[in-house]
């Protein structure tokens, strides 16, 4: 299969290149950038010398359609809604890593992203690509989930799909490494601001909130809202999500573990930790794994769920490739069989 990557110079695009380089059934046909053409990626990223030798090209839909079977769009939100349409119309596999097609309600997108929304027709064609819970595996147009949404939804899914949560009790405390802010530097991501520091940002206003709610209410329509906070922590990669919920009825620790283990029994990239063991960000670094730890406090009737992912892999490029594997009927783990980098 031939693929093109639009937005190849960003962190998401770079991860797609790294992972697809190991894929047994995929060849990268073309790489595209808005900011640089004619240069090779190695010009900007020396670690890719002799690996990414094709020049970066401007975006030419006719050429991309002619040369590729699949298009990955790894651009900031607000771009894919305009550039993805020709590839969808041509019947190519299209996987968008931005937020442009995730929300089915155009008004919600415009409220939370502050940009004009994609045409209704195309929003309707896109399937939300939470890989472990995809319903239409033959779909060729995927809205890849956000990093916070992936960690949160995988953490809540076993309880939410079985309608076991007290619907007003969900509290999510999510923390992200600096790469989650993207490649373009800013004052808030400057080393002197982030080193030895932790910053709360977008309190009650993060754009992944409606995305999470859209999926949660699909599983359990009684959930009215979530309390969701996001923080920036001084690590390069990783999402560390701590979720607190109350079950509708008391549950034992063993019942809780059994529920999660049975839900993810056939999910190659979700690993449930043993009882009283909680995951760290480092144990999933540079991998497509989501590791989940669980605890139940009988005194307070509170379940604590710890869900960790690499924001650039399971939270972006890795899940995008996992979605490609599902739609193309490849082995789900092809191109993703990476042992996490440690230490």
Curated annotation (Swiss-Prot):
Keyword DNA repair recorded: no
Annotated InterPro entries: AGPR_AS, AGPR_type-1, NAD(P)-bd_dom_sf, NAGSA_dehydrogenase, Semialdehyde_DH_NAD-bd
Keyword Ribosomal protein applies: no
Catalysed conversion reaction: N-acetyl-L-glutamate 5-semialdehyde + phosphate + NADP(+) = N-acetyl-L-glutamyl 5-phosphate + NADPH + H(+)
Pfam families: Semialdhyde_dh, Semialdhyde_dhC_1
Active site positions, chain numbering: 147
Localization: Cytoplasm
Coiled coil: none
Disulfide bridge map: none
GO BP field: L-arginine biosynthetic process
Superkingdom of the source species: Bacteria
Pathways involved: Amino-acid biosynthesis; L-arginine biosynthesis; N(2)-acetyl-L-ornithine from L-glutamate: step 3/4
Enzyme Commission (EC) number: 1.2.1.38
Class in the EC hierarchy, top level: oxidoreductase
One CC-aspect GO term: cytoplasm
Record keywords: Amino-acid biosynthesis, Arginine biosynthesis, Cytoplasm, NADP, Oxidoreductase
GO molecular function, one term: NAD binding
Function description: Catalyzes the NADPH-dependent reduction of N-acetyl-5-glutamyl phosphate to yield N-acetyl-L-glutamate 5-semialdehyde.
Record-linked PANTHER family: N-ACETYL-GAMMA-GLUTAMYL-PHOSPHATE REDUCTASE, CHLOROPLASTIC-RELATED, N-ACETYL-GAMMA-GLUTAMYL-PHOSPHATE REDUCTASE, CHLOROPLASTIC-RELATED-RELATED
Family: Belongs to the NAGSA dehydrogenase family. Type 1 subfamily.
Protein's name in the database: N-acetyl-gamma-glutamyl-phosphate reductase
Organism: Listeria monocytogenes serovar 1/2a (strain ATCC BAA-679 / EGD-e)
